[in-house]
Regions:
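Ubiquitin-like/PB1-type beta-grasp interaction modules and other compact soluble beta-rich domains
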Residues: 1-65
């Protein structure tokens, strides 16, 4: 299935969860915020949210600085 990830098309296995996407992108353990179709999804729900074709997923990484 195809989703839009940070504005770019990306093909994923059907039913992939947000957490599985984070692992596939090798981003686990990082400070991230995820939104699906402009709705922020709390980290504790990432295993429960299965992505659907044409979902728009935005991943934002927190970067410390001064």
């Amino acid at each position: 299935m195809e989703i839009v990830l940070n504005g770019a098309p990306r093909v994923l296995p059907p039913g992939q969860t947000l957490n599985e996407l984070v692992v596939a992108l090798q981003l686990e353990g990082q400070a991230l915020a995820l939104a699906v179709n402009r709705s922020v999804v709390p980290r504790q729900r990432w295993d429960d949210v299965a992505l659907q074709a044409q979902d728009r997923v935005d991943i934002v990484r927190a970067i410390g600085g001064g």
